[in-house]
Amino acid sequence: MICGIDEVGRGCIFGPILSAAVVFKKKPNFIKELDDSKKLTKEKREYLSSLILENSYYAFGEISNITIEKINIHNASLLAMQTAYENLKLNCNLVFIDGKFVPKISAKNVKAIIKGDSIIDEIKAASIIAKVKRDKLMDEYDKIYPLYLLKKNKGYPTKEHKNAIKKYGVLSLHRKNFKLI
């Protein structure tokens, strides 16, 4: 069994960092359509996400902005990946991680792959479902905090988002140790 893990939200100034772990039940017929989530349109990501969820074992790991502030974004990213793998509750022979650092994972063989979200199909799939899940979370927060344009910026430090912080203040879900806040 091969597992791919990726995270999303590392560069955000609002909300959690979210990670996904994916193991395909069998090689899916849509495998050639997979790519790094950042290279796909929103519509394509959502379409592929539903296919991935139907055809794989998957789990998520979510680390709050408060924990990010306590342990830093690097450690929070590793913890999110570790949590996603633990939540998967499978013993995988091989786990591919997007990036250059390996979280504490109890699998036999764990490999960090730089740009893995463009190379390894399981990481591509994890990238897609993590991005779709976090984007939907930001859409929900946008309903609560519409002045911060979270539906548009997804928690990233856009000019509009930074201007909203200056005008309306920092929210409890902002990452306060981020340099821009």
Swiss-Prot record:
This is Ribonuclease HII. One of its GO terms (molecular function) is RNA-DNA hybrid ribonuclease activity. Endonuclease that specifically degrades the RNA of RNA-DNA hybrids. Residues 1-181 form the RNase H type-2 domain. The keyword Cytoplasm applies. One of its GO terms (cellular component) is ribonuclease H2 complex. A divalent metal cation binds at D6, E7, D98. The gene is rnhB.
